[in-house]
Amino acid sequence: MFGRLMPREGKFFELFDQHADQIAIGSVELVGLMNQYADTNARQRHIEAIDAIEKAADRYTHETVALLHQTFITPFDRESIHQLITQMDDILDLIQDVAESAMLYDLQRITNEAQQLADINQMCCERVKAAVNLLSSMENANQILKICAEIDRLESDADRVMRSAMSRLFRDETDVRQLIKLKAIYELLEEVSDKCDDVANTIEGVVLENA
């Protein structure tokens, strides 16, 4: 009984950190997939790696939710904890969606814009990891808020690349099937950065409420 009343902040932050590690690793694999897409063996390795990373992250998500139900005193409000871990999980779900869609659609090529979006996503994910790693101490508040602002800027960069990519796609692509496939991949890639920005907004809210 008393165990349920004791704060277990450390375990929550440990799970956040472990999940954030998987996000960063997954984003590296996504860049590898986009850059080495023409190599069938490398492509398959990256897809399999992303699938394994997503499964590992799912375990951390489920463990966090279970801990939330078992713990009476939490490091910050329960709704924000659930929102944060769910949004973090969404990032890797989308990275996996990109990998699976590329395979399912049997894309003939990956464009420079898709590679640029993957690069931006990696930078976003690295900053998500950095912000999450600092979240256990509100002494890091200013640094966390700075990182969140960087994620917001990168998300705007992704929007600009997306607009340019779509413009060129509809202007230059003559194969309708290829156009539809690439459009879907672009949208998934952009959504990764959107989800990173959602995480940044949630973290920013936690910091402003608790600093």
Feature-to-residue mapping (PLM):
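Cytosolic, long alpha-helical scaffolding segments
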Residues: M1-A211
